[in-house]
């Protein structure tokens, strides 16, 4: 036990001062339970009844090894103690009694900070009951150790609690230890024996090492790779796997679309069958089911498996690798195979590649390969001689079915296939009589007379070809005009090439070529239908445009006809009066004539006589011309007398009577002349209108003076 005594006499005085100032422990002594002067909260000293720290004992002579951390100096009051000496002694004791290890952040309790929660604040506690000097000393002595308030001075220092408050849930020191131990164990596991090191030292060679670099192309991601390692990493990578999942989903959607198209076609066929059944022209058809197509169809399963939709779906769902001669259950397995090292090696050896190389390759088929595709008719077994009559009946039925095939098509063929299967079943039952059984050749199918057997450039295919399609016959060639020679023989329908003419001839009799030929004819027929529809639509459009033009021209023609009829009835419109200037000129002339015609006015009699004489001369000329025109019109008539009598007498008064009214009105204001002229035109009697055809006949010979004079009658 090491004790240091510094200036004992002042210490005693401090104790006495602490007795006096004991009641000032906690700012007004409002909370006596937290009195730092003594009692149960006697920090740094033994538990005793002297609550004011009356024991004459050095503050550093404590049983607590860490007594220097807080000590009894928390009970010290007043400013007589030398602050520097206390700080020096406090730091000295801390360095002596603390752990000998260098300070580390891992030793901090819980939160690891200098100011934790309220119960974890370290350093010398500030005694609020003491004087100002003690508080100053405690503030300057913050470098002391950290201790929990709950620890008693007599007992040993408790270890810091683990898992306390704050952000850290585990002690950082323990966590670091566990991590180091874990890494050490892993390193021990990875370290093999020296003998094993020599075996595993060489790295594994990539399975794509023997594949040429130009073959490293991923057709799913459409990416080119530069070497074997990069290609292998791409195949195992996340991007490639995600792309593969998306393409697999697209394959599923496309397969469903093909199935839906087949279902729609079958529904249309069933509707047609129902219609024929209602009309009494067809009997009930039996439905069958295809698992791959997920389809209920009319006919036999063997006929359905040869149909275009079934073969298309089968080729899509179960592709075949030509280079490796392998078939796959799903298309995604086929894609995986195309990226395998085995396939790429064979593709490089055969100088073929998926994509560009495969398109550039020209495979030429031989006679042996094409002979494999010939489909010979299956022979049926015939029962013994005892049942010759039944066999003859069966042949008759079969011939009848063959005759009906031209009309009913694939359905009759399906029935024939069913009959063939029934006959085969009957023969199986009599296998014991093999000696008496004989084989009978199947009769070749009968084609319609006008069936299509060939197509040349320029030939027209009709829109309806269902009744003109030939049946398959392995002894007859179809479409030989579609096979041309190009240093070899090419079939444009099947896109295949052959080495000799014999091979081409055999190919024209194969089932694949026959199926492609029927597909080609149907496509041409649909093209013809489309062309006909387009031509009909063009004709209809032209007719519609013509009708629209005629409808637009009809009102104009009607208006012109009405104008001509009005001109024939009477010349009520003068072209010279179309503008306002002509009307003004005529109005001035009317005023002048009205002034000349006025009688009984206040003007001089000499002027009236002159004007009257001029007017009379003009009227005489007009009457003479009207009489000539009327005579010209009346010459073809048999009775000219009744028409001549009213003509010379009546036109003169209407010209004079309305002319008197505007003369009186023209004297005060010349503006009233148009109204007067209008009244004169309206007041003209009907005989003047009857004389208008004569004026129309003589209109070409009329003088300008006469035109102005006539303006009063036909102005409006």
Curated annotation (Swiss-Prot):
Residues 657-704 have a biased composition (Low complexity). The modification Phosphoserine is found at residues 201, 206, 673, 684, 686. Residues 103-168, 182-208, 350-447, 534-716 are annotated as: Disordered. It is found in: Nucleus; Chromosome. The modification Phosphothreonine is found at residues 203, 692. One of its GO terms (molecular function) is single-stranded RNA binding. Residues 639-656 have a biased composition (Pro residues). Keywords: Chromosome, DNA-binding, Metal-binding, Nucleus, Phosphoprotein, Repeat, Zinc, Zinc-finger. A motif (Nuclear localization signal) lies at residues 379-383, 544-548. Residues 188-203, 350-359, 386-401, 415-431, 541-551 have a biased composition (Basic and acidic residues). GO terms for biological process: mRNA splicing, via spliceosome; regulation of mRNA splicing, via spliceosome. SMART domains: ZnF_C2H2. GO terms for cellular component: catalytic step 2 spliceosome; chromosome; nucleus; precatalytic spliceosome. A zinc finger (C2H2-type) spans 216-240, 288-310, 319-343, 489-513. Residues 405-414, 432-447, 560-638 have a biased composition (Acidic residues). The keyword Phosphoprotein applies. It comes from the Eukaryota. The keyword Glycosyltransferase does not apply. Residues 707-716 have a biased composition (Basic residues). May play a role in the process of early and late gene activation, or possibly in RNA processing, for a defined set of developmentally regulated loci. This is Zinc finger protein on ecdysone puffs.
């Amino acid at each position: 036990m090491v004790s240091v005594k510094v200036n004992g006499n002042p210490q005693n005085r401090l104790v006495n001062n602490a007795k006096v100032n004991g009641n000032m422990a906690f700012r007004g002594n409002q909370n006596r339970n937290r009195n730092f002067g003594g009692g149960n909260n006697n920090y740094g000293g033994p538990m005793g009844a002297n609550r004011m720290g009356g024991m004459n004992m050095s503050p550093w002579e404590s049983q607590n090894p860490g007594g220097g951390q807080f000590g009894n100096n928390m009970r010290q009051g007043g400013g007589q103690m030398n602050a520097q000496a206390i700080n020096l002694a406090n730091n000295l004791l801390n360095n002596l009694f603390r752990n000998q290890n260098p300070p580390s952040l891992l030793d901090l309790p819980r939160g690891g900070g200098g100011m934790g929660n309220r119960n974890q604040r370290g350093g010398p506690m500030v005694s609020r009951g003491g004087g100002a000097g003690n508080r100053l000393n405690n503030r300057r002595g913050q470098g002391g150790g950290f201790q929990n308030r709950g620890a008693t001075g007599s007992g040993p220092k408790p270890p810091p609690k683990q898992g306390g408050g704050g952000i850290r849930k585990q002690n950082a020191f323990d966590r670091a230890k566990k991590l180091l131990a874990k890494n050490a164990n892993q390193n021990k596991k990875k370290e093999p024996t020296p003998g094993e090191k020599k075996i595993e030292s060489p790295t594994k060679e990539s399975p794509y090492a023997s594949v040429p670099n130009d073959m490293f192309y991923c057709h799913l991601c459409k990416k080119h790779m530069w070497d074997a390692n990069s290609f292998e990493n791409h195949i195992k990578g996340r991007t490639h796997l995600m792309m593969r999942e998306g393409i697999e989903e697209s394959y599923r959607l496309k397969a469903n679309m093909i199935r839906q198209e087949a279902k729609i076609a079958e529904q249309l066929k069933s509707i047609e069958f129902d219609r024929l059944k209602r009309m009494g022209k067809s009997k009930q058809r039996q439905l069958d089911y295809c698992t791959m197509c997920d389809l209920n169809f009319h006919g036999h399963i063997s006929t359905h498996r040869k149909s275009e939709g079934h073969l298309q779906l089968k080729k899509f769902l179960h592709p075949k690798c030509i280079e490796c001669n392998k078939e796959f259950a799903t298309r995604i397995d086929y894609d995986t195979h195309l990226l395998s090292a085995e396939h790429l090696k064979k593709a490089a050896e055969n100088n073929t590649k998926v994509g560009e190389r495969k398109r550039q390759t020209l495979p030429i088929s031989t006679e042996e390969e094409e002979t494999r595709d010939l489909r010979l008719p299956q022979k049926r077994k015939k029962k013994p001689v005892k049942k010759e009559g039944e066999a003859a009946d069966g042949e008759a039925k079969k011939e009848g079915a063959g005759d009906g095939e031209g009309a009913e098509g694939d359905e009759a063929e399906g029935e024939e296939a069913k009959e063939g299967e029934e006959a085969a079943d009957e023969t199986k039952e009599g296998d014991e009589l093999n000696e008496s059984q004989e084989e009978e050749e199947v009769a070749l199918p009968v084609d319609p007379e006008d069936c299509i057997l060939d197509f040349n450039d320029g030939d027209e295919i009709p829109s309806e070809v269902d009744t003109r399609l030939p049946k398959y016959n392995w002894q007859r060639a179809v479409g030989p005009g579609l096979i041309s020679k190009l240093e070899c023989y090419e079939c444009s329908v099947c896109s295949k090439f052959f080495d000799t003419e014999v091979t081409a001839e055999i190919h024209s009799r194969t089932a694949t070529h026959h199926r492609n030929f029927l597909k080609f004819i149907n496509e041409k027929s649909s093209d013809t239908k489309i062309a006909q529809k387009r031509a009909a639509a063009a004709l209809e459009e032209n007719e519609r445009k013509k009708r629209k033009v005629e409808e637009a021209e009809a009102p104009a023609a009607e208006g012109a006809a009405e104008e001509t009829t009005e001109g024939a009835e009477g010349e009520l419109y003068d072209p010279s009066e179309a503008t306002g200037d002509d009307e003004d000129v005529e109005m001035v002339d009317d005023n002048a004539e009205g002034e000349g015609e006025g009688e009984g006015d206040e003007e001089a009699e000499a002027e009236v006589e002159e004007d009257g004489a001029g007017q009379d001369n003009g009227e005489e000329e007009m009457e003479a011309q009207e009489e000539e025109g009327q005579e010209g019109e009346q010459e073809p008539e048999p009775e000219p007398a009744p028409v001549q009598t009213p003509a010379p007498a009546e036109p003169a008064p209407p010209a004079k009577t309305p002319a008197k009214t505007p003369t009186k009105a023209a004297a005060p204001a010349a503006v009233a002349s148009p109204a007067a002229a209008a009244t004169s035109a309206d007041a003209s009697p009907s005989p003047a209108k009857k004389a208008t055809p004569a004026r129309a006949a003589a209109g070409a010979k009329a003088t300008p003076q006469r035109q102005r004079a006539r303006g009063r009658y036909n102005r409006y």
